[in-house]
Amino acid sequence: MAKCMWLALALSLLSLGWGQDACVMDVNCHLPDCNCASTKSPFSDLPPEFTPQFVVLSFDDAVTVTNYGFYLNLLNTFKNPNGCRASMTFFVSHLYNDYAKMNELHRLGSEIAVHSVTHKPDVEHYWRPANYTVWRDEAVDMKEMLKMYGYIPEEDIKGFRAPFLEVGGNDMYQALYDSGFSYDCSWPALQYTNWYGEEPLGALFPYTLDYLSPQDCTVGKCPDGLFPGMWVAPMLDLLDNRGEACAMLDACQGNNTDCADQTCEDNVFNFLKRNFEYNYKGNRAPFGVFTHHSWFVLDEINESTAHTNGYMRFLQYINSLPEVYIVSMNRVLEWMKNPLPAMDLGSHPAFTCPTFDPETNCLDPITCEYREGLPDPGLKEVLMTMCSRPCPTNFPWLGNIEGK
């Protein structure tokens, strides 16, 4: 009886999400431009080893001298089964961003995406009521500065994440859609995971908004409009050690038998391993570990190595498993558009790598000092390292990206 009730709930959720026109692959939705929301792998009718297990590591906010070494170590430590270096996605905001170091992460194969210019802390009065114009200006101005000061090619800037995951509904998606972004990764999913409920509905794979989304809305305003070809990369909630859901790693807490507040390395490792295996031993939906570098800085504050060592142990563990690829979100989406079995992934254009890294296009970076005209009266000085010359007259900011 309970199973029947849960099935009825699932069907009702789907009907609410898709409305009268259900999305049906190869009938009214065709790759690579359209993909129905689904909890099934493209190879779900074959043994699990046919579906690669993607792990997406993402970091939000500025790339700085403080976190750059940590990121570089990850890139130089881990390689995928095809012999290519692991890649990550950086959702970048402007203040304190070192555009030269960011450029180097891109040169080494990682993805640079947009997180807004201002990243204002006032969710209630700024992000929550933000209209189309606010979202467009925040996204487009940041994209332009990634190009202007970091020499990131426009065609490589595809993704967006809303500050504080405050999804901005149709206004946000329309702004991204009109501005040439191809995906958003701001939208947490709780009900569509491999662990939620007595009989989980399953974890969502990335999908496009050609049809109404069935995804539950836990933060912000989720879209109820159609944006053909626009991808949603669901942020599958993790189950932390308290038994609570969390979309970002630094929001996950809890305890096991010996350690409180996730300060124990074993707790961190076991927490990540447990959540990863929900997908790896389940439907193999892409598994995201989304965080801020500040989570690792807490180790220094607490005179601990728990976060860093637990995280690295987890990456070493998954790096030893077959069919597991640590890749940027844009590569996952390229696979969704043209899925190949894990054993053939080496021939996929998005998963090849050059014998030698490309030469840098950031040949002579410059560091500019700004003490006046800063966006926050509490700021005394801001340094901005960039690939282009000369230094802008004023500190570049929203609405004045050239610093005139």
Which role does the model predict for each range below?
Residues 204-213, 229, 364-391:
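Low-complexity, serine/threonine/proline-enriched polar segments
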